[in-house]
Swiss-Prot record:
Tissues with expression: Expressed by the venom gland.
Cellular component GO terms, alphabetical: extracellular region
Residues recorded as bearing Lysine amide in the entry: 35
Domain of life of the native organism: Eukaryota
Organism per entry: Cupiennius salei (American wandering spider)
Entry's localization field: Secreted
UniProt protein name: Cupiennin-2a
Record keywords, A-Z: Amidation, Secreted, Toxin
Coiled-coil region: none
Keyword Electron transport part of the UniProt annotation: no
Keyword Protein biosynthesis annotated: no
Amino acid sequence: GFGTILKALAKIAGKVVKKLATKPGATYMLKENLK
């Protein structure tokens, strides 16, 4: 169902965020993407 898709996307997003968090400027990039 749709909920399963959202959970899968959340897991992927979490992994991406963790990878970006180790790089300088990641916070700035995330803020820009959320605008």
